[in-house]
């Protein structure tokens, strides 16, 4: 979801983005992922407090805030780097848009930013900085939901990229995630960095650490399916 996503095509890693250009990428990924997690967790806490006892309304509030925040973050940071998602970064490595070192550094920045975003959200709402989530999210239906959610996300990004319409990625991804909150059983985590960060807040958006490994596996599977589908639809980038 960034300028390198000329990206998710089959080009060699750009050596010109070594140290000097890697630093802005890492900052953008850390800040973007962090603020995304803050939006997810923070809006979940706000929804619980503002609409107690109405889970449907809470989810609507959480979905709208997350989708809006994600759209803005992509639009603002896309000229630098706006993946905010290790699945997308892994695809950039597989398609040789990034080198192995660049991809690993980017994922590390996403994970660190996500953790910081969880702490920030907790503190803003006067919660302890870190509380281990206790919400179990497990079972075949939820796992299938995560495969579908991530496949749709990657299909959206890759199809727009391979068809030369990257200017639409910001709003398309934001709208997709807002919708996927509702049409997937898992409420569309669709992002390993965000999933891991959500372990750190025992609030509306939290996920029990025991539920995380299966979610991560489903996200990787979904990412692969979404990418292969997009390549089939758009064989010539």
Model segments located where?
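Membrane-interface helix-loop junctions and terminal tails of multi-pass membrane proteins
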Residues: 1-237
């Amino acid at each position: 979801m960034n300028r390198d996503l000329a990206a998710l095509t089959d080009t060699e890693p750009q050596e010109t983005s070594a140290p000097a250009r890697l630093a802005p990428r890492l900052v953008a990924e850390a800040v973007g992922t962090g603020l995304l997690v803050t939006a997810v967790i923070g809006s979940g806490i706000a929804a619980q407090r503002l609409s107690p006892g109405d889970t449907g309304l809470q989810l609507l509030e959480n979905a709208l805030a997350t989708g809006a925040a994600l759209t803005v973050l992509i639009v603002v940071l896309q000229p630098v780097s706006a993946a905010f998602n290790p699945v997308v970064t892994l695809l950039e490595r597989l398609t040789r848009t990034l080198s192995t070192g660049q991809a690993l550094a980017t994922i590390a920045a996403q994970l660190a930013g996500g953790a910081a975003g969880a702490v920030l959200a907790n503190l803003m709402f006067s919660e302890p900085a870190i509380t281990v989530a206790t919400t179990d999210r497990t079972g075949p239906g939820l796992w299938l939901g995560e495969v579908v959610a991530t496949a749709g996300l990657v299909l959206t990004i890759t199809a727009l990229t391979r068809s030369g319409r990257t200017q639409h990625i910001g709003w398309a991804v934001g709208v997709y995630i807002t919708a996927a909150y509702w049409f997937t059983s898992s409420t569309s985590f669709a992002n390993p960095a965000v999933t891991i960060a959500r372990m750190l807040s025992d609030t509306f958006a939290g996920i029990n650490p025991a539920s995380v490994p299966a979610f991560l596996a489903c996200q990787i599977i979904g990412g692969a399916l979404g990418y292969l589908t997009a390549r089939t639809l758009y064989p010539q980038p």
